Amino acid sequence: MPCLLVAGLGNPSAKYQNTRHNIGFMVLDFLSKELDFDFSFDKKFNAEVGAINIGPHKVFFLKPQTFMNLSGEAINPFVRYFDITHTFVIHDDIDIGFGDMRFKYGGSSGGHNGLKSIDSFMGDTYFRLRFGVGRSANKNVVEYVLSDFNAQEREQLEGLIAHAKEAVMSFCNMAQYPKEHILTHLQQYFTLKIPKLTPSQTQNNESFATQFSQMQYTRFTQG
């Protein structure tokens, strides 16, 4: 049975669990609940690992316990040991707005230390879900990504993480096709650009449940 790997990046320890840098872990935790599988620690790979069958594939879900900057130390040996056909990495991205999602295969790490670590071990030949967290005007990058999502962002997270879950499922169901077809499909149907709230929406503190039903998400194909 062909094997796939979905890896979410983050830092272990409870103090990091709600931080922007841990969005990869958050998506995998949501998948665990929705798809009814459990994570268990695998000492061989220094990672939390879960697995289920989706269609013709065995799909592994992995949360490295190495800390972000050493993510490749867990992912690379896992990919080699199980002869993984395709790897899909979910990570935070400060270069796109909060909640925006983009997909790519290969290419630059964009300065993300978790991706740098993976690339140093196995190159850049893997799929990526770039989950936008935006930037801060007041905090440096490290302080910002290691801080918790704010209250307004937390209201939106559940719907956004659910969208990311659907993208993961689509990847798993299409994994038998050439990587170019998989990437085009993800970019066309799951790329997300969140309309920014107007000042009145922000002042009125509208719930995301209401906003979600009204928003017209803009999907676009990356060049």
Swiss-Prot record:
HAMAP family: Pept_tRNA_hydro_bact (MF_00083). It comes from the Bacteria. One of its GO terms (molecular function) is peptidyl-tRNA hydrolase activity. Disulfide bonds: none annotated. TRNA binds at Y16, F67, N69, N113. CDD domains: PTH (cd00462). The record marks D92 as: Stabilizes the basic form of H active site to accept a proton. The keyword RNA-binding applies. The gene is pth. Its EC number is 3.1.1.29. Belongs to the PTH family. Gene3D superfamilies: Peptidyl-tRNA hydrolase (3.40.50.1470). The keyword Metal-binding does not apply. Signal peptide: none annotated. The record marks N11 as: Discriminates between blocked and unblocked aminoacyl-tRNA. Monomer. Keywords: Cytoplasm, Hydrolase, RNA-binding, tRNA-binding. PROSITE patterns: PEPT_TRNA_HYDROL_1, PEPT_TRNA_HYDROL_2. The active site is at H21 (proton acceptor). NCBIfam families: pth (TIGR00447). It holds the Pfam family Pept_tRNA_hydro. It is found in: Cytoplasm. GO terms for cellular component: cytoplasm. InterPro entries: Pept_tRNA_hydro (IPR001328), Pept_tRNA_hydro_CS (IPR018171), Pept_tRNA_hydro_sf (IPR036416). Its main location: cytoplasm. This is Peptidyl-tRNA hydrolase.
